[in-house]
Amino acid sequence: MGLHLTVPGLRRDGRGVQSNSHDTSSKTTADISRCPQHTDAGLQRAATPGISRLLGISSRSVTLTKPRSATRGNSRYHWVPAAAGWTVGVIATLSLLASVSPLIRWIIKVPREFINDYLFNFPDTNFAWSFVLALLAAALTARKRIAWLVLLANMVLAAVVNAAEIAAGGNTAAESFGENLGFAVHVVAIVVLVLGYREFWAKVRRGALFRAAAVWLAGAVVGIVASWGLVELFPGSLAPDERLGYAANRVVGFALADPDLFTGRPHVFLNAIFGLFGAFALIGAAIVLFLSQRADNALTGEDESAIRGLLDLYGKDDSLGYFATRRDKSVVFASSGRACITYRVEVGVCLASGDPVGDHRAWPQAVDAWLRLCQTYGWAPGVMGASSQGAQTYREAGLTALELGDEAILRPADFKLSGPEMRGVRQAVTRARRAGLTVRIRRHRDIAEDEMAQTITRADSWRDTETERGFSMALGRLGDPADSDCLLVEAIDPHNQVLAMLSLVPWGTTGVSLDLMRRSPQSPNGTIELMVSELALHAESLGITRISLNFAVFRAAFEQGAQLGAGPVARLWRGLLVFFSRWWQLETLYRSNMKYQPEWVPRYACYEDARVIPRVGVASVIAEGFLVLPFSRRNRVHTGHHPAVPERLAATGLLHHDGSAPDVSGLRQVGLTNGDGVERRLPEQVRVRFDKLEKLRSSGIDAFPVGRPPSHTVAQALAADHQASVSVSGRIMRIRNYGGVLFAQLRDWSGEMQVLLDNSRLDQGCAAEFNAATDLGDLVEMTGHMGASKTGTPSLIVSGWRLIGKCLRPLPNKWKGLLDPEARVRTRYLDLAVNAESRALITARSSVLRAVRETLFAKGFVEVETPILQQLHGGATARPFVTHINTYSMDLFLRIAPELYLKRLCVGGVERVFELGRAFRNEGVDFSHNPEFTLLEAYQAHAGYLEWIDGCRELIQNAAQAANGAPIAMRPRTDKGSDGTRHHLEPVDISGIWPVRTVHDAISEALGERIDADTGLTTLRKLCDAAGVPYRTQWDAGAVVLELYEHLVECRTEQPTFYIDFPTSVSPLTRPHRSKRGVAERWDLVAWGIELGTAYSELTDPVEQRRRLQEQSLLAAGGDPEAMELDEDFLQAMEYAMPPTGGLGMGIDRVVMLITGRSIRETLPFPLAKPH
């Protein structure tokens, strides 16, 4: 359905893939239209399978009705234009057929003569009349009011003639019947046309009637003179004095005069020629009469300036946005001026170019204005090159969307020439480089005028068409001073001769979009590939993050039809496209884009009704320049004369007559930005504070000044002597106004105090001014001396104050604070500002970290920092986070543990070393787990895991002492009483020696049945079944024991306990037990069901270490995301010998949880939270 119409219309600059036919397919590069945008989120494929779906096209069926503003309400006479058009169209068709076929003329002779005599002019043979009727029928269907007037006048005239004939009488019965019937038909037609007057609303150009008359008169005169000359040359039997009249009758009289009135006949072939002369005159006149396209189909300077302003504000997402500045387009704006649509009218189709330009929120208003314009002039709306978001907007306005293909988008950050998939491009680039080609990349503004003139000359000489092509995806002007930000990429040979060029227009501030591609016939193979690759590889230095290349029409059809197992319809459709590719190079374009491994982004065509698809296709072919109509204005210089900019925007004086971009800051001030109206949507309390801020600024008060240190903290001020002069800074938490005296509560990190403002004590101003300028939550600096209120409350007697930070949003409830736990996490800054308990928690965490460091420093440990970004994930069994480094084009992992790097330091001789830092594990989130956490790892040479039992206990007890003032842990407790349930924390003593138990003994006690390291797998599985513990069949005995431990021991432990001697198979980095077979020297510290830390006697045997890591790597290769990868660098370091070492790993977050009795989300300042 219209495929032959849409394909060529999407080419970019009027060329095929190659501009020199001698090149082979290996160096083809697309040079057609393109189109970007992001996702296909808004457009879902039609639910009902159709032929377009089977072929690989996604036809978007419309289920939404047009908004009321886009269509006129249907009246009972809405059918009149179509009925009139069809009636006249049938007569026109029969008249044309009768003019070319004597047989048809003989068959319809009787009804034709009856219609001609009594109903409607239906001459014997006359091309002119046939074509005029066809144009009249089309105009009637398009609801042109001038066509209604022409038809009505014809009916009235015919009715008057019939009425006169009836009144004259003397006719035969047959003639009387015909005249009466004709008169009745005319009266009915006149009544229907008058009643349907409002259905013919489409306008034509002003003065169309006079222009049409002038065209017809000129054409008729030329036709009569030419026909007279032919009659004189070939008179046949026609009398000399009747030749001029005969010619005039045939040319302009529609052969209405009976041929018998003339003496003789000219040669037969002349009648057809005479009719053509008349046809040309009448067709020209009719076209001018019914034409609704504006004469100035172009942008004015103000229009272009407004478009550039909208692009600066909103154009960062639209790769086709810059093409809206093409000057042979017209534009229609939303009433607000925040969005617009550029378009061109061809063959009665108003063809919109891509997405609306401007604020997405104003797109519906721009589409509505465009549809109203189409309706006013009777144009059929059509869209070429819409993005997914744009097509969704057009759908919501009542149009249908059809996916045409995909645009190739390159992401320079991901582009590389290495890899098997880039072999073709790499080889082409190598060939071009061997030929000595280099690439030069410059902005147009950096090119001298004479050099740009040479560039334009080269572009014209290398073009394989007479004129530039393009509409929706081409700029059509090279070297214009207004396009100084465009990018020129040139391929230069060793003799400094330019052999090829790419010109790209801006796509926002960080992208470029291909506009022009040219190459010399002498350019070597791979020239285009070299330019594209060099542009992508050097994009970062140019500030480019995305490159829009060419458009692949029906890409999905090529791709799906070539897949293994593709259905017969998909293969047939692909075969048809391959066949047509002989002329339109469709497959070549797809493959030339595909070789760069781009991101494919869909583009759409939109239309109102399936019946207008051919017209939309023809309009796109004409607009793109593939079909040039007679008297086309395509190659003329386009400068519009009638600005379309809304008066509100034009009146600002920001727009420029030369089309240059306006001042963006000025556009923001007149409300053309996303911030327009923000304050009107703010809550009332926030709006009041913004208003107060504006008043302060207008009074010359800086609400956010440069800071200066206060002389005292609040705590120090409260401890200062009476009458001591102090200055403090803090946040206002409460205000009590008693007229001349005002009390406020001021809080800083150290505490809270009362400040007293008395008019008699203030150096300047009064308390009322303070009350008017400040709100709760404001930051202020207070100066004065310490004293007391009448009630004896220690207070700062204020002599001067300064606002140092205006709080523009109200604080939470001053009594209850933030009660919602999720809100406390997401707005931790507010939680800390109003909640003393939260400030205590963050202080306790700091104390824990400091105590851990001080304890280790006291024992001679050295603190180091090891890489967080690692090439391999190892050191623990956990799922890692993956990121990517563009410089080396490789994946990296956020470390799950620093162990392997710390052991490298141990090999180097660092005997006591630790790291206190962040680790990352892509696992669950709950009360005790966060994907990002703080981990302590410490290693001590010449020690084992047993030495770390006392060391770990000492670290935790010292941390508790620092945070709580005693070696105690806080545990949640719930008491139920008469006044309800009360939740609180109670201290638990954790001083002294903590229990130590083996893993197998603890499990045996929980099961009531003895197990050890020699217990078989079958027995362990039976015990799991009996205890209800799940397991996997691929697990070995060690993994099953670990599962029993986690379900039966770890989760039931309360007091801090060390569980030692874990199975060897689940401890890949731990040395085997020195005396027990099947277990490793490892312990886990557990308290109240949470593992706090673990320690190993580290495995220092490099041979055994390699064997175990190879087992882990096999698991990783088999799909286990938590298994460690083989780290050859680490193993090589171990082969240089590491001393016997004991290692400790401890989760600092869990230690803080133990000491404070809080969850991990409460103890972390900013735990990971789900997005809203």
Swiss-Prot record:
Cofactor needs: Mg(2+)
EC number: 6.1.1.6, 2.3.2.3
Polar residues: bias regions: 17-31
Transmembrane segments: 80-100, 122-142, 146-166, 177-197, 214-234, 272-292, 612-632
Membrane topology, record value: Multi-pass membrane protein
Annotated catalysed reactions: tRNA(Lys) + L-lysine + ATP = L-lysyl-tRNA(Lys) + AMP + diphosphate; L-lysyl-tRNA(Lys) + a 1,2-diacyl-sn-glycero-3-phospho-(1'-sn-glycerol) = a 1,2-diacyl-sn-glycero-3-phospho-1'-(3'-O-L-lysyl)-sn-glycerol + tRNA(Lys)
SUPFAM superfamilies: Class II aaRS and biotin synthetases (SSF55681), Nucleic acid-binding proteins (SSF50249)
PANTHER family xref list: LYSINE--TRNA LIGASE, CHLOROPLASTIC_MITOCHONDRIAL, LYSYL-TRNA SYNTHETASE
Protein name per the record: Lysylphosphatidylglycerol biosynthesis bifunctional protein LysX
Source organism (scientific name): Mycobacterium bovis (strain BCG / Pasteur 1173P2)
